[in-house]
Amino acid sequence: MADERKDEGKAPHWTSASLTEAAAHPHSPEMKDQGGSGEGLSRSANGFPYREEEEGAFGEHGSQGTYSDTKENGINGELTSADRETAEEVSARIVQVVTAEAVAVLKGEQEKEAQHKDQPAALPLAAEETVNLPPSPPPSPASEQTAALEEDLLTASKMEFPEQQKLPSSFAEPLDKEETEFKMQSKPGEDFEHAALVPQPDTSKTPQDKKDPQDMEGEKSPASPFAQTFGTNLEDIKQITEPSITVPSIGLSAEPLAPKDQKDWFIEMPVESKKDEWGLAAPISPGPLTPMREKDVLEDIPRWEGKQFDSPMPSPFHGGSFTLPLDTVKDERVTEGSQPFAPVFFQSDDKMSLQDTSGSATSKESSKDEEPQKDKADKVADVPVSEATTVLGDVHSPAVEGFVGENISGEEKGTTDQEKKETSTPSVQEPTLTETEPQTKLEETSKVSIEETVAKEEESLKLKDDKAGVIQTSTEQSFSKEDQKGQEQTIEALKQDSFPISLEQAVTDAAMATKTLEKVTSEPEAVSEKREIQGLFEEDIADKSKLEGAGSATVAEVEMPFYEDKSGMSKYFETSALKEDVTRSTGLGSDYYELSDSRGNAQESLDTVSPKNQQDEKELLAKASQPSPPAHEAGYSTLAQSYTSDHPSELPEEPSSPQERMFTIDPKVYGEKRDLHSKNKDDLTLSRSLGLGGRSAIEQRSMSINLPMSCLDSIALGFNFGRGHDLSPLASDILTNTSGSMDEGDDYLPPTTPAVEKIPCFPIESKEEEDKTEQAKVTGGQTTQVETSSESPFPAKEYYKNGTVMAPDLPEMLDLAGTRSRLASVSADAEVARRKSVPSEAVVAESSTGLPPVADDSQPVKPDSQLEDMGYCVFNKYTVPLPSPVQDSENLSGESGSFYEGTDDKVRRDLATDLSLIEVKLAAAGRVKDEFTAEKEASPPSSADKSGLSREFDQDRKANDKLDTVLEKSEEHVDSKEHAKESEEVGDKVELFGLGVTYEQTSAKELITTKETAPERAEKGLSSVPEVAEVETTTKADQGLDVAAKKDDQSPLDIKVSDFGQMASGMSVDAGKTIELKFEVDQQLTLSSEAPQETDSFMGIESSHVKDGAKVSETEVKEKVAKPDLVHQEAVDKEESYESSGEHESLTMESLKPDEGKKETSPETSLIQDEVALKLSVEIPCPPPVSEADSSIDEKAEVQMEFIQLPKEESTETPDIPAIPSDVTQPQPEAVVSEPAEVRGEEEEIEAEGEYDKLLFRSDTLQITDLLVPGSREEFVETCPGEHKGVVESVVTIEDDFITVVQTTTDEGELGSHSVRFAAPVQPEEERRPYPHDEELEVLMAAEAQAEPKDGSPDAPATPEKEEVPFSEYKTETYDDYKDETTIDDSIMDADSLWVDTQDDDRSILTEQLETIPKEERAEKEARRPSLEKHRKEKPFKTGRGRISTPERREVAKKEPSTVSRDEVRRKKAVYKKAELAKESEVQAHSPSRKLILKPAIKYTRPTHLSCVKRKTTATSGESAQAPSAFKQAKDKVTDGITKSPEKRSSLPRPSSILPPRRGVSGDREENSFSLNSSISSARRTTRSEPIRRAGKSGTSTPTTPGSTAITPGTPPSYSSRTPGTPGTPSYPRTPGTPKSGILVPSEKKVAIIRTPPKSPATPKQLRLINQPLPDLKNVKSKIGSTDNIKYQPKGGQVRILNKKMDFSKVQSRCGSKDNIKHSAGGGNVQIVTKKIDLSHVTSKCGSLKNIRHRPGGGRVKIESVKLDFKEKAQAKVGSLDNAHHVPGGGNVKIDSQKLNFREHAKARVDHGAEIITQSPSRSSVASPRRLSNVSSSGSINLLESPQLATLAEDVTAALAKQGL
């Protein structure tokens, strides 16, 4: 493992430092031997390399070592250097930090945090023990480091924010020092400095000094013997128990336990072997919190080791030792703060304990506690060496029993041994208690108690964690928490140590509690009793917190920072990921997931189980010390308690499964995540101040370090990428994902920083809590349903990351589970990265959602953080690319996203498999949403009401049809701000389902507030800033969606058809989340509009690249702001085109082509297509999301403007949305959500009339789509199979990480049909989909007939994506109808179809529409064109169905001229049916070209998956080109108000000749995307609605709208390629198509319509037009390309820069800057030694050495005998050598005679050739002549007897002599 490598390299490196310092140190050999491999005791501790032990034990400690090494390098690696440099500085800094922390401990915040953290740590112990020990191990050191460091980091952040006074010296006061400390955190020592209180450094330093003398004296004998004995025992025991220990270590999330194990591995060997060196350090060092402790330990170890291990100590702590410092620091802290532990650890260390920097208080307590703990140590001996075991905590009971007599070393070692034993032993709780008793009697007993209390608490509270998984996780996490609690107590003790009275009291209390706990620990069998004792201990801790007063909150907070720093470390290193892995592995997968869900906060792993426990404990502590915490802290703790109370009520419901509990925690985290967002923002600031690079750097490190773990810990990555993710993307990401990154503990104990930031938010939070309570009530009924959803979706979102967590997820998401496990390892890194982007965004959305209600000020900050997320969308993008395989990231992320969303979807699917019910609910919800949408439009408050009702409906939908509902809602959400708000609700609920009911409530509350803001925002959406914000947010969200889409696309690959449905749903959910992010960001921007500068500055700061792209989008938006509808429509068109083309194919191809996935995002905006390519590499979903966000914003604004009807459309569109998610689900979720929101509004309009029919159709489509997220094409295939025109057969082979789409284009079909086959998983649904598609097509047709105005739009939205062929048919009808409306457009459209397809159909139409179409027409057409364009883009992806963009455009058209559109749609539907009839003949007349056109359209659906590739593929296939032009035509017609535009799109299969122009068009379309978007957005709205209406109404060809079929609005002037002059405008043979509107009644003649090709002249003209427009397309490409490039370059460039930064940070942290440095040192030395050894070995092998050795051995006889053999047998080869040897060696006659004898006898001795050679040098001078004679006399050497033989013999002898000598 990397850990092994790092351990090896690190160990050598560490050994170099270690040996250097060990050489200085008396115990250096022991250190070398024990820590020789070293990351501090890496190998020596176990008797075999710690890495091996890790590996052997877990493979997790290998990762731990790796991560600790990474941490060492990334965070601790510097610390190693800094520690070496500034051990004294570290000591001073530690003193400062300890002072600050002591103050913080007095505040009690640290204790809370430590308790909570200890709980998670302890929980992971059992959980890790129980579950996936190997996956956990990599995080164990890293988790420890990461969790501890992250915890420390988070603590630092928290302490910095709320507790800056708490951590004034540690974090707040010495930010420089913090930076140094964070460097030291980066360097374990500094982290420990941070982590360990002042006493800890002193304890580490002084106890080591004492222990160096004492251990050298008293314990060296015990230590050396004990180290040897115990080293052997410990190594053996560790080897034996290492797996268990590693599990406990992992169970501790490597925070305390893994540190203990590691430390105790370090400590045991070092503590025992070099107890002087490490002895005290290890026992002292094993503080609960590795990060700070590691700092302290590293600092302390350098200090107490006389800086012998200055570098090595940190180094050992780094690799194995970073985990070790957890225990070491814990022990340090315990020794210092809770002197009972110090005495237990150092009972012989009374001097050392007294000498601890604790000073008199510590000395007193050392004596005091030493005696009790010596008594306890004796008790420990009595108590099956439990306390002695606890002393070392990791020492095994055998060794402990053996060495219990050696209370100091024996007890320490025994404690370490037993601690390890306990940690590793299944009786982890008992041994943990035992461990806890001596080692941290207060601390570890606290841990055990906390462990038990946590388990108890979790059990009692269910702690939102499943008891079973949580209890295991509680044991594991409680172990970590115990470590942390021990740290808390230690911190309390240290705080009290700083305040001797308080310390004594705390220590006394700790001793009392420890004794009590020890007593209980003596009875560890009773886990409930343990939990009771834990509760007592928690009470003790609470009492301590009370004793500490404010210090309790401070301790909790400070320790929370430890924990947070652990999270921070996990951000850098998957330390927390270890816990998360432990949690996840434990089947606490929920914890794992939860951590992942909290944006992968590593602390969420600790605090996921822990956050619940931690928050509960925090609540207890907060309740106990609420007076003491700052008002905001206490208030927020109270809020958290209230929130927790609200949620625990839910969460107890949720705890049904660990995932659910985790989810509940995550909802809590998300609920408090807003607070944590602020906190994380501060944390980010802290991280940045600390030089962590802020969230980005942390994320980078986390990515680089955590990504490797991510395979094991995709959730750990999720956690650390939740956490790391929080840190990584942005400060806002941190803020947004603070719950994950900064801490779920922070989330759960937001009272720290979030309270400060959210002090104004508290009332709102209460509001939110009330809303959440209401939501909980609303959700309450659904909670059971949602519970499964939230349980599964939460893991789906959060736990997907790790296959580990898949175990809990598996039951709920069986399909996703399988995929997840696959993806867990494969996409763990990317998935964590994805979690960073997607869950973070989800968190951002949720937090922001809550925040806008909470406080506008907070919201701007959160938008800031979210904008930073957007800005760090780069990092999110980079996070995906961060692992060099962008595809891995994206694929893994995609799969994770799929799990992340797919699980939700799956749960929703499972909950609401009946799409009919979903449809009904969707119809009801859509109608309610219509009402609410109108309300939203009317007033934000009614929007909030609507949100509530819509939320209820959404929840019902979710409960019943979580997949479809989420899809609908996400899409609704994206499409209109009102819908966006609704979708926010939906997305929140989607997220809630992903996160859990608790978060659903929180999100719902947030959404209520957010939606109140959202209507404003939606209204503001038209304004440039909100749009920009939306753009940026959308960029973020789109990025996340891209990520999630890729996740979805990749994860469900293995999943199944249902998984695909879930994937579609999940993508939709992710889109919903992303859209939530969009809308929340929009809402935040609404708030930010209030504080636009802040938003802009934050955008500019954090999302400079995004802002550049966003500014491009903003420029577009501002361009379009004048024509906001156009902007929205244009963006929507882009989105739809992108979604239809890019997303659909992205589903299939995203895994294969993350680039394509990116492109999918960008095809949405053709501009972004090129950008998408960059996005692919840089994962710049941001730029397309910017366009998408612009589209979404504009669309949303437009929807709000035009969307009183939209609500109807919403519901109807929702089915379409599911279709879109299927097609577009992965990169399109935003786009899909955005488009579907509009489409949905339109659909809701239709839904009023044909809602149920369409819903049935859509539900089927949705079901199919959901089943086949990648199978959107499959939908197309299925849809198209009935209608055989151009048949694009896509065989989607879904492999683990890749979706391979093989597209075959056949011209056989009547209608262009895109048949998508999913090789294994999805094919059944493929087959099944055609039916729903056809049924739904008919239903949609009926619905179209019913709701003609919406018919094309809703139907098109639903069908274009879902039923590609049905909509191809239907669109053909709609399109033909549209053509009938616009006769010229129809005839032109055939040509235009080619042209439009070439031009990506959306943009060419947009461009032409802009100039050619009158403003009236433009207004109408634009209104339609956005939808049309969207559908075009979608339909290019999905052929007719893929033209869902048409529904959006139609929706836009309907929004603006919705009334007219409806009437027209109805009128045109009548005409449409007539035109359909006419068009059937026409289509038959145009049959060849139309088939080709439709075929390209369908094929375009596939190729568009690669945004450009897909479009170009479409262009190539001609069908794709036709499909886009059909889309455009259909869009234009839909824009004209013909809701049949989907059919028309489909009905106008473009000639294959479109293909070349299509490709050109796709490029031009990309280029023109901006221009088209800008110009066409106005033209779109104006021209689109009216010109198409005119065309539809008049049925006459509109010369002004030559391309008005789809391009009608602005086709000729703006888009030359469409109207390559004027030829296409009037002369399109489709001009006769005008009658089609009348003729093509909206009868769904799928075959006839699609079959009817553009009039044969139109096809040539189309080809000609295509050829002509291609230059225009180039121009368009210039526009689009410039825009895309602009968007992309800023974003891409920034992203790239950020990627570079992240790469450097990660590469350095991971690979080698620091790791390699350490490794180089160690590796270089080892290599050099190896070389020497190799030389020796080579010589030995060759025989020179052997011969040299053999020479004295008297090998003369052997040589002679060999000579005989050689002469006889190998005369030439061997004989020559033999002769040479023999001549010199056999000079003596005696030798000759012997030789002769030997020759006779020694033919078997030919082996002695080497010996012979050896002798030859010795004899060479004397007997070579005689030997020749002898040889001759031998007779066997006769041949060799020649002088040549003598010469050879002499030469060989000389050579051999040289060699031998």
Swiss-Prot record:
Post-translational modification: Phosphorylated at serine residues in K-X-G-S motifs by MAP/microtubule affinity-regulating kinase (MARK1 or MARK2), causing detachment from microtubules, and their disassembly. The interaction with KNDC1 enhances MAP2 threonine phosphorylation.
Region (Interaction with KNDC1): 704-747
GO-annotated molecular function: actin binding; calmodulin binding; dystroglycan binding; microtubule binding; protein kinase binding; SH2 domain binding
Polar residues: compositionally biased ranges: 354-364, 598-613, 780-792, 886-896, 1087-1096, 1514-1523, 1615-1625
Region (Calmodulin-binding): 1454-1474
Functional summary from the UniProt entry: The exact function of MAP2 is unknown but MAPs may stabilize the microtubules against depolymerization. They also seem to have a stiffening effect on microtubules.
Origin superkingdom: Eukaryota
Subcellular location: Cytoplasm, Cytoskeleton; Cell projection, Dendrite
Tau/MAP repeat start and end residues: 1664-1694, 1695-1725, 1726-1756, 1757-1788
Gene Ontology CC, one term: proximal neuron projection
Membrane-crossing segments per the record: none
Composition-biased stretches (Low complexity): 839-848, 1548-1559, 1569-1580, 1593-1609, 1816-1829
Protein name: Microtubule-associated protein 2
Compositional bias ranges of the Basic residues kind: 1432-1441
Modified residues (Phosphotyrosine): 748
